[in-house]
């Protein structure tokens, strides 16, 4: 899989991609990263990336022309182009799973007031992290990349993926490590019992309880999915 990030701030993107799991995935040749500063495609001598909005209003609007030129330089018939913007569909685990099937993913990071709307005609999907505004799309791009790359086969242990939060619409079960007694707060005895069936049942129960408590929206989806399977 190849992932290309179009950004004005490549110095923000590369450190994350060259660390931890992302670096391991690159080293294992499971993913290839490319970061393009689309400022280089500006045609004026000042390399102007934004301009005032037609019709007035506050803030500067990112010019579509240099971004389209950057797209033309890196896009192939196998590419999926994703614009990162607050009005996009909220990113989720199923979306990350779907993106793993993409041969070439291109992520466009915005900044300032937003994009010239004519750019929207040239993208395949619009993604956001949620109902809030960030200064730029780089954090969104890195979140999408991390969530997607770690699902690529061979990047991390398959068993770890099975028990992660959001699989089957449930949060992960609570985890504990040493010491056993932390200022009187002890690890649940069942986890020390050695009875794997009881431990598995306990963890499933905790998943249900935690999801209902912390993410009732997910819990409703879990129940709906369960009812659907039982029909």
Swiss-Prot record:
It catalyses: guanosine(37) in tRNA + S-adenosyl-L-methionine = N(1)-methylguanosine(37) in tRNA + S-adenosyl-L-homocysteine + H(+). It holds the Pfam family tRNA_m1G_MT. Keywords: Cytoplasm, Methyltransferase, S-adenosyl-L-methionine, Transferase, tRNA processing. This is tRNA (guanine-N(1)-)-methyltransferase. The keyword Cytoplasm applies. Its EC number is 2.1.1.228. Specifically methylates guanosine-37 in various tRNAs. One of its GO terms (cellular component) is cytosol. S-adenosyl-L-methionine binds at residues 110, 129-134. One of its GO terms (biological process) is tRNA N1-guanine methylation.
């Amino acid at each position: 899989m190849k992932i290309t990030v179009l950004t004005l701030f490549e110095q923000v993107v590369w450190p994350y991609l060259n660390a931890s799991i992302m670096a391991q995935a690159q080293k294992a040749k499971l993913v290839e990263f490319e970061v393009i500063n689309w400022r280089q495609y500006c045609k004026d001598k000042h390399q102007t990336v934004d301009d005032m909005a037609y019709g007035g209003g506050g803030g500067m609007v990112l010019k579509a022309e240099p971004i389209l030129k950057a797209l033309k330089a890196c896009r192939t018939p196998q590419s999926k182009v994703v614009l990162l913007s607050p009005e996009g569909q909220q990113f989720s685990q199923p979306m990350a799973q779907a993106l793993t099937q993409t041969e070439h993913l291109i992520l466009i990071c915005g900044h300032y007031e937003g994009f010239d709307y004519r750019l929207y005609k040239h993208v395949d999907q619009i993604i956001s992290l949620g109902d809030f505004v960030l200064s730029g799309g780089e954090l969104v791009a890195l979140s999408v990349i991390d969530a997607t790359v770690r699902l690529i086969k061979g990047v991390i242990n398959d068993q770890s993926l099975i028990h992660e939060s959001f699989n089957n619409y449930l949060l992960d079960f609570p985890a504990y490590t040493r010491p056993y007694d932390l200022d009187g707060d002890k690890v649940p005895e069942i986890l020390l019992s050695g009875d794997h069936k009881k431990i598995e049942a306990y963890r499933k129960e905790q998943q249900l309880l935690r999801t209902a408590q912390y993410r009732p929206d997910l819990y409703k989806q879990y129940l709906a999915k369960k009812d659907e399977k039982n029909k």
